Swiss-Prot record:
InterPro entries: Ribosomal_bL17, Ribosomal_bL17_CS, Ribosomal_bL17_sf. This is Large ribosomal subunit protein bL17. The gene is rplQ. PROSITE patterns: RIBOSOMAL_L17 (PS01167). GO terms for cellular component: cytosolic large ribosomal subunit. Part of the 50S ribosomal subunit. Contacts protein L32. HAMAP family: Ribosomal_bL17 (MF_01368). It comes from the Bacteria. Belongs to the bacterial ribosomal protein bL17 family. Keywords: Ribonucleoprotein, Ribosomal protein. GO terms for biological process: translation. It comes from Limosilactobacillus fermentum (strain NBRC 3956 / LMG 18251). The lineage of its organism: Bacteria, Bacillati, Bacillota, Bacilli, Lactobacillales. GO terms for molecular function: structural constituent of ribosome.
Length: 126
């Protein structure tokens, strides 16, 4: 199994990937370094594939990985509906890619980071 170590221990790397994947689900795009984006792309494709299945086991696997954060708050008169990142993944993102087999994300290269010259990219959902 090959993966990028990203200069971190395994627990730190897993936490980083969980955070970046959750941010991508909530915001639709993130700005990060190129190696991180390439790793997040793998996990995001896995999460969308699980969401497309839509069964209980897939939902539980995704819930074990995606952070429990608020993705959207909708007000409808007196009712306030709070949507989590997991609900956003299963209800909004997965139906959008129902007829697509992989390749759910796009990497756009931007200018290098000013401080250390690291290659920066924008990772977004297609």
């Amino acid at each position: 199994m090959s993966y990028r170590k990203l200069g971190r221990t395994s627990s730190q790397r897993k936490a980083l990937l969980r955070d970046l994947t959750t941010s991508l689900i909530v915001n639709g795009s993130i700005t990060t370094t190129e190696p991180r984006a390439k790793e997040v792309r793998k996990t995001m494709d896995q999460m969308i594939t699980l969401a497309k299945k839509g069964d209980l086991a897939s939902r539980r696997k995704a819930a074990a990985f995606v952070r429990n954060v608020v993705a959207d708050v909708k007000e409808d008169g007196d009712d306030i509906k709070i949507q989590s990142a997991l609900q956003n993944l299963f209800e909004d993102i997965a139906p959008k890619y129902a007829d697509r087999n992989g390749g759910y994300t796009r990497i756009l290269k931007t200018m290098p980071r000013r401080g250390d010259g690291a290659k920066m990219v924008i990772l977004e959902l297609v």
